[in-house]
Amino acid sequence: MTEQLEARVEDVVQDIARDLDEEIYVLAPPKQNYLLLEVALSAAASLLLQAFVEGTKTVIADASADGIRVGFRRIMHSLRNRFAGALDEPNSMADDDANEARRNIASELWELRKHWTATQLESLTAKVQLDFQQALIGEGMSEGAAVSVATKLGAATTRLLAEADDTSV
């Protein structure tokens, strides 16, 4: 894995963070959602992107409808727990969590790129985007916001996977 890919993940996370809508607040535990104002949106974007990449790995592991449903339920539960954990921490610790998430994203993208063709990954990302969108709606996000967030995450993942390929040369 290269530092170049990790830097690109950081750039993409910042782009996503700039575009996040207020709807992101529904993913925080109800008693803590106001605390998202205190946590950098880049931390939220990092966690969302990591969850999306985990969704891609879930679909690879078990592409059956039940496998995907169970996998996304687990991912959304994990995402809520990570949000709760980040909200319970001082901002510096939340930033550390976000940095770790970005490193994990770069590592996972690198691994995916080593084992799958660009065409396979593009198709897979489109499938995950739809599943992720439904999972966000299931977590209480409005349909419009879920479509917007899932589309941004799908586009970011596709772009990063292409760049992971470019950095491997």
Question: Which sequence ranges carry the predicted segments?
Answer:
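Short amphipathic alpha-helical segments that predominantly mediate membrane engagement
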Residues: 1-42, 69-169
